[in-house]
């Protein structure tokens, strides 16, 4: 546990020196597992010898400073030179105003659907009547210019810095 606390201090100091504020560093709960050594007598398994516990702890950086986090993610192996066993993952990207974006996208998609329906009605010699039903599809976030496929349950890409958001709206109108 003392080693874990020492490493935590070194990691915190490192991240702060790289431009991350202390309140952006979130240490998760300490996880523990037993460390055993398999024992053999004359080539036959004779049980385990308990060696102690292995403690691990993960951390997360919650920051809006994307460039700083990306730079740190490329340089984080510097901690290995300080004797820290460290496993890192690539940054994940979240749009912080997603709720507002959804409302705006629903509004635009609805207006676009109506304009298309009016065009279809005009081109077929009819007129667009009253709206009889409206259905909203799944909100999708995919990597920009990626070949990610849309999903019935929705897609939520967090690995791409540049993302594309889409939604499908189905409007049913009476035809006159």
Show which residues each predicted segment covers.
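Short, charge-dense linear interaction motifs
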Residues: 1-176
């Amino acid at each position: 546990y003392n080693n874990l606390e020492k490493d935590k201090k070194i990691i915190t100091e490192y991240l702060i020196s790289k431009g991350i504020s202390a309140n952006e560093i979130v240490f998760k709960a300490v996880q523990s597992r037993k460390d055993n050594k398999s024992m053999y007598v004359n080539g036959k398994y004779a049980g385990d010898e308990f060696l102690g516990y292995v403690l691990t702890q993960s951390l997360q950086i919650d920051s809006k400073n994307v460039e700083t986090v990306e730079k740190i993610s490329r340089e984080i192996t510097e901690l290995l030179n300080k004797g820290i066993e460290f496993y890192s993952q690539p940054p994940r990207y979240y749009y912080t105003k997603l709720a507002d974006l959804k409302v705006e996208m629903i509004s635009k998609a609805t207006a676009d659907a109506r304009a298309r329906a009016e065009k279809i009605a005009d081109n077929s010699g009819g007129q667009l009547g009253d709206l009889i039903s409206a259905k909203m599809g799944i909100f999708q976030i995919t990597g920009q210019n990626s070949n990610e496929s849309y999903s019935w349950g929705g897609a939520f890409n967090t690995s791409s810095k540049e993302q594309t958001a889409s939604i499908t709206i189905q409007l049913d109108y009476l035809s006159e």
